[in-house]
Amino acid sequence: MEVILLERVAKLGQMGELVRVKDGFARNFLLPRGKALRATAANREKYEHMKADLEARNIAAKAEATKVAEKIDGQNVVVIRQASEGGQLFGSVSVRDIIASFDGQGVKIDRSQVLLDAPIKTIGKHSIQVAVHPEVEVAVSVTVARSAEEAERINRGEDISTRREDEDAAAEALAAAGEFFDPDAQFGEEQPTEE
C-alpha cells in the first residue's frame, strides 16, 4: 500500500514522502495513529492543503522537544535492583523502570520514546537513546546498582567487584573453622570414643 507520511517516521521516510509499506503496517500502525494517509488523488490534494499547517506543528513540536532534550541530555538516572555477587540482576530493568526514574526527576517521557533494544540484566552504567521527537534524539545513562552507595561508586568509575574481599573473608572463615575440626580425620568413619 502506498501512503503519504504526515510526519517523519524512523527507518521509513520524511514528512510528505510517498512510500510503499505493507498493508498491515499501514492499517494497524500508520493510519490509526495519524502518521500517514492513503495515497489517493483526494488525499494528495488534502495533503497539499494541510502541508503548511503540518510543517508549522512539526516545527513547534520540535522546538518543545529540543527543550526537553536539553534538560535530559547526558543525564544519569539510578535504578536500584537486587543482584547476584557476579553482577547479574534478579530480573531486569525495562523501559517502564527507566520512565519511572525520569518521572522521579520531574521529566515526562513516553514509553515509545525510550529506545532500548533489550532489557538491562547486569549491574553497571548503560547508555541508552531517548527519541523525544522523530528528529531529536539524546543519549542518557542508566546506572543499575544494588544500593545508592554502589551507584555512587559506579558513577565515580570505581571497580565494584568484591571478589577480592570475599576471598579474604572466606580464607579467614576457613582458618577459624580449622580450630574446631581435626584436619586428619577420615570422613565416613566414626572415630572411637574413649570411655
From Swiss-Prot:
Database matches in PANTHER family: 50S RIBOSOMAL PROTEIN L9 (PTHR21368)
Organism per entry: Rhodopseudomonas palustris (strain TIE-1)
Keywords assigned: Ribonucleoprotein, Ribosomal protein, RNA-binding, rRNA-binding
InterPro entries, per database record: Ribosomal_bL9, Ribosomal_bL9/RNase_H1_N, Ribosomal_bL9_bac/chp, Ribosomal_bL9_C, Ribosomal_bL9_C_sf, Ribosomal_bL9_N, Ribosomal_bL9_N_sf
Family from the record: Belongs to the bacterial ribosomal protein bL9 family.
Ranges that cross the membrane: none
Name by which UniProt lists this protein: Large ribosomal subunit protein bL9
GO molecular function, one term: rRNA binding
NCBIfam families in UniProt: L9
Cystine connections: none
Matching Pfam families: Ribosomal_L9_C (PF03948), Ribosomal_L9_N (PF01281)
Gene Ontology BP term (one): translation
GO cellular component terms attached to this protein's record: ribonucleoprotein complex; ribosome
Chain's role: Binds to the 23S rRNA.
